[in-house]
Structure formats: structure tokens, C-alpha cells
UniProtKB/Swiss-Prot annotation:
Signals that turn on the gene: Negatively autoregulated.
Positions of the HTH lysR-type domain: 1-58
Name this protein carries in UniProt: HTH-type transcriptional regulator CysL
GO molecular function: DNA-binding transcription factor activity; transcription cis-regulatory region binding
Stated family: Belongs to the LysR transcriptional regulatory family.
GO BP term, example: regulation of DNA-templated transcription
Gene disruption phenotype: Cannot grow on sulfate, sulfite or butanesulfonate as sole sulfur source.
Signal peptide feature range: none
Residues that span the membrane, as ranges: none
DNA bind region: 18-37
Keyword annotations of the record: Activator, DNA-binding, Repressor, Transcription, Transcription regulation
SUPFAM superfamilies: Periplasmic binding protein-like II, Winged helix' DNA-binding domain
Protein function: Transcriptional activator of the cysJI operon which is involved in sulfur assimilation. Also negatively regulates its own transcription.
Amino acid sequence: MYYDVLKTFIAVVEEKNFTKAAEKLMISQPSVSLHIKNLEKEFQTALLNRSPKHFTTTPTGDILYQRAKQMVFLYEQAKAEIYAHHHYVKGELKIAASFTIGEYILPPLLAQLQKLYPELNLDVMIGNTEEVSERVRMLQADIGLIEGHTNENELEIEPFMEDEMCIAAPNQHPLAGRKEISISDLQNEAWVTREKGSGTREYLDHVLSSNGLRPKSMFTISSNQGVKEAVINGMGLSVLSRSVLRKDLIHREISILHINNFSLKRKLSYIHSPLMENTKNKEIFITMLKSNYQSQLLK
């Protein structure tokens, strides 16, 4: 390629020595000589006045040196601009997120993205896990963030963090004053929960069924805030992410029941369709998602 040949000619003129030019370019001296020979053949003129001890540029060599500097600069500028075009983060990124993630976990990351990439327009749609999966499957979102699992086999799923779940209770509940409880103490309790299709509801159903717990009643509300308000007002217990309860715990509006030798954890994941193009915007988002939360993911 003429770019390499011109760079060789520039190095020879500036170093005034074939050997030094070869060292600078990290190529062999015969390659340097061949490049100069090919240039002289191309332009049908002598570019260098050679002597046993030194050389000088001919008038045509001076012309080529000036133009070669310009051409190399323009080539490298074009290369940098093309790279920037493909790697510059701008445009739109459509994110679908479940309620817990979208309302309590995602906002700090979005603020970080906005600060680093001010020309990136973020379009965040919040719904339950089932709705998020459907949006990604229908290519209405570049990426989805869900709690639990998805039944959409055509989507790719990757965990990005581990979420601590808590059993929330009204402060006046009989179990709230105990340091620890056993899982059997939760038998025949009233529960407040999210709607079907929610990852939080799926997790509660799993906890109840896997431990043989029969609820006295189930009260369904389709928002985390609604569930919390119901618990605060004494309507029952609930299982919610600690991130959802953080402010309520600080203000001591809700109690957490600690179960002896029992851990409540789930994985949060991102999903995307293999049919959707992997854009730079999505790659940047996934990289930041992992760097912010991957340390909280226990393998």
C-alpha cells in the first residue's frame, strides 16, 4: 500500500539514513531500499542524490516529501474519523426493564451513561418481566432487564447481578419483634404480592411452594410502591428486593423478618434477541452494566 511506502520515504528524508529509518519503522533495511526504488520507478524520477557517505533529496524528492507529509496526514485523519464514526456513542438506546430494576437499580447507571455519553438518547420502558420479554422478542427494545426467568426460548439471557430478597412485614406484626424466625412461622400468613408475570411474584410463588407454605390470603397489587404501602398498613407480609425497601428501612417504616439458616437471593439478567443488531450503544450499556454490578453476582 502506498501509505506504507510514503511513510518510508518520509522517514528516510527525516532520518537522513536508511538504517535509522528502518529502525524507526521496525522494518528491514532492504525493505526500505525497495520502497524507495519502487517510488522512483512509479514517478520515473530520482528522488535522492546518493553518495557513499550521505544523500540529499532531489528537487522532485523535495516535492514528493511535502506532498507525502500531506497525504499521510490526511490518511491518518480519515482513519481516525472513520473509527470515531463507528465507535462514537450517540443516537438512541431502547431499554425495557422490570419494575424493580427500572425503578430502583437502573437509575444510577442511567445517570452515569448520560454523563459519559451526553448525545445518547435513552428510552426506558418499564413493565413486569413478562412484558419486558415480549418487548424484546418483538424487537421493540434493544435490550431487556428482568428478574427471574423468561419463557421466550428465542431470546438470549445473561445474569448480571445477584439480588437480595427480604420478607417485609408491618412493624406491628407479631413476628416483627423477633430476632429470628423459622420458615414454618410463615405458615398460614396473609401475603401482599405483585401480579402474575412479575419476577417478584414468581419468586414468592417459588418460596411458598418449595417450602410447603400455605397462604391465608393473597392480595395482588401491580406496583412495588403499592405493595409496600399495603404492608406498611398491616395488610400482610411480602417478599421484595432489598433495593425496593432501602428508604423504608432507613425511615423504619417496615420490618424485615430474618429466617434462621435461610437465604433469599435471585439473579437479575439482561436479555436480547439474536435478530437485533449489536450496536455500539448496546455494547457500551452491557459493559457498564457488568462493570457496575458483576461483582455482586455469585457464580
